[in-house]
């Protein structure tokens, strides 16, 4: 990122912090409402290398919340749209895209080129089995000295209160239905710890389905998934720079 574009970052994180961001590699898996907005914020935050993983194309139902979704991008691969957006924001950012669906079986192979070089991984995956598989892989690689910091987004559907979002270990979560299922599956798969962003808000009740008995999809507010993505990006950036906000609002260097 050129110095003019980075001047507000330098004022907050200092030259050392901005250099750490420019040298960092962050992998974002899932470019939906959370992941696409997280990737955009990471690009604006000066991350030097982004790896973007998703297999979907932009659909009309994405427009209310996803950074990749415009009437002009309908039908296009989300990875392609996100890559163009990142390059337009920060031409100096190196972008790798992986147009693939993540499974328990292909996850090690897809991540293999980046293992040992990842400063952070953002899990914005929709499916629980893949989320836990990623957490288990991070744990197993960590035992070999090749692990990576991982933060996982929990459910933002049918929720309206971003002030109730919290970072916690999965074992300390409550209220969120996805977290309940994740805790159970983590125990089953031997995942001991997983940092997550979750909401303490009780989800709104779903609107009843039609006469055919089909359940309506989870509702999503235009602001909730993007705020979650922005919060995760902020969390990652603060961890990479070693700077956090003090109670008085002054930036403080974290102890390592």
Segments predicted by a language model, with ranges:
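N-terminal charged helix/coil linker that caps or initiates catalytic domains
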Residues: 1-26, 60
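Conserved N-terminal Rossmann-fold NAD(P)-binding element of oxidoreductases
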Residues: 28-30, 53
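Hydrophobic/small residue at the entry helix of a nucleotide-binding pocket
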Residues: 34
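Glycine-rich phosphate-binding loop and adjoining beta1-alpha1-beta2 segment
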Residues: 47-90
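Conserved SAM/SAH-binding loop
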Residues: 98-107
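Short amphipathic alpha-helix with an adjacent loop that forms part of the alpha/beta core around
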Residues: 106-116
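Glycine-rich phosphate/adenylate-binding loop
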Residues: 114-119, 127-136, 140, 147-150, ...
């Amino acid at each position: 990122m050129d110095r003019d574009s980075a001047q507000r970052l330098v004022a907050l994180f200092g030259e050392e912090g901005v250099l750490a961001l420019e040298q960092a590699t962050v992998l974002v898996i899932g470019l939906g409402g959370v992941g696409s907005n997280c990737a955009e914020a990471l690009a604006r935050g000066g991350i030097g290398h982004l790896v973007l993983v998703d297999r979907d194309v932009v659909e009309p139902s994405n427009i209310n919340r996803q950074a990749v979704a415009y009437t002009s991008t309908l039908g296009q691969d989300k990875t392609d749209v996100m890559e163009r957006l990142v390059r337009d924001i920060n031409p100096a950012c190196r972008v790798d895209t992986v147009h693939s669906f993540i499974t328990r079986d292909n996850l090690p192979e897809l991540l293999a080129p980046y293992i040992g070089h990842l400063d952070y991984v953002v899990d914005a995956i929709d499916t629980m089995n893949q989320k836990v598989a990623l957490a288990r892989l991070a744990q197993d690689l960590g035992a070999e000295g090749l692990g990576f910091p991982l933060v996982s987004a929990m459910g933002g559907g049918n929720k309206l209160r971003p002030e109730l979002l919290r970072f916690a270990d999965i074992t300390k979560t409550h209220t969120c239905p996805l977290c309940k299922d994740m805790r159970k599956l983590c125990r089953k798969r031997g995942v001991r710890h997983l940092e997550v962003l979750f909401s303490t808000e009780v989800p709104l009740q779903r609107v009843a389905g039609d006469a055919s008995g089909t359940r309506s999809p989870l509702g999503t507010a235009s602001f909730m998934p993007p705020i979650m993505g922005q919060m995760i990006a902020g969390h990652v950036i603060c961890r990479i720079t070693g700077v956090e906000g003090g109670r008085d609002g002054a930036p403080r260097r974290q102890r390592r």
